[in-house]
UniProtKB/Swiss-Prot annotation:
Protein name: NADH-quinone oxidoreductase subunit B
Root EC class: translocase
Subunit structure: NDH-1 is composed of 14 different subunits. Subunits NuoB, C, D, E, F, and G constitute the peripheral sector of the complex.
Entry's Gene Ontology BP terms: aerobic respiration; electron transport coupled proton transport
EC number: 7.1.1.-
InterPro entries given in the database record: NADH_UbQ_OxRdtase-like_20kDa, NADH_UQ_OxRdtase_20Kd_su
GO-annotated molecular function: 4 iron, 4 sulfur cluster binding; iron ion binding; NADH dehydrogenase (ubiquinone) activity; NADH:ubiquinone reductase (non-electrogenic) activity; quinone binding
Membrane topology: Peripheral membrane protein
UniProt source species: Legionella pneumophila (strain Corby)
Compartmental location: Cell inner membrane
Gene3D superfamilies listed in its UniProt record: 3.40.50.12280
């Protein structure tokens, strides 16, 4: 190829870390873990008005096909082992979004004997979405924040 032909072509220069971060953030497949009224708002996000497909987000029915878990609602003590089991079945790398006051810290039922005071006591949480219940826009903002976090995280570690 002549130098004149190469000058006309457009090249994109980047690092492997930026490329992998872009690919991971652009193809998030969430596993929904709806426990209460926040799950209804999570369903709104999946509808046509917000169109998560444009962000590369497709809800998956199996934890083995997912890389993001959205915990939406009140986590009780009996459900905590199931949450951990589903989290452990997800392949690495995996991320967790805690959606709503109940998932974040127990919410209205904080002092109940049967409620876990935050799902971060069971699984590590990457993004907290506040609200009771949070709006679909708030969850969408949380998903965008998780995408930004994934892009910033180094992929290759020495």
């Amino acid at each position: 190829m002549a130098v004149a032909e190469l000058e006309k072509k457009v090249f994109e220069l980047t690092t492997v870390e930026k490329l992998v971060g872009w690919a991971r953030s652009g193809s998030m497949w969430p596993m929904t873990f709806g426990l209460a009224c926040c799950a209804v708002e999570m369903m709104h996000v999946g509808a046509a008005r917000y169109d998560l497909d444009r962000f590369g987000i497709i809800f998956r029915p199996s934890p083995r096909q997912s890389d993001v878990m959205i915990v939406a609602g009140t986590l009780c003590n009996k459900m905590a082992p199931a949450l951990r089991k589903v989290y452990d079945q997800m392949p690495e790398p995996r991320w967790v979004i805690s959606m709503g006051s109940c998932a974040n810290g127990g919410g209205y039922y904080h002092y109940s004997y049967s409620v876990v005071r935050g799902c971060d006591r069971i699984v590590p949480v990457d993004v907290y979405v506040p609200g009771c219940p949070p709006t679909a826009e708030a969850l969408l903002y949380g998903i965008i924040q998780l995408q930004n976090k994934i892009r910033r995280k180094p992929v290759l570690e020495a």
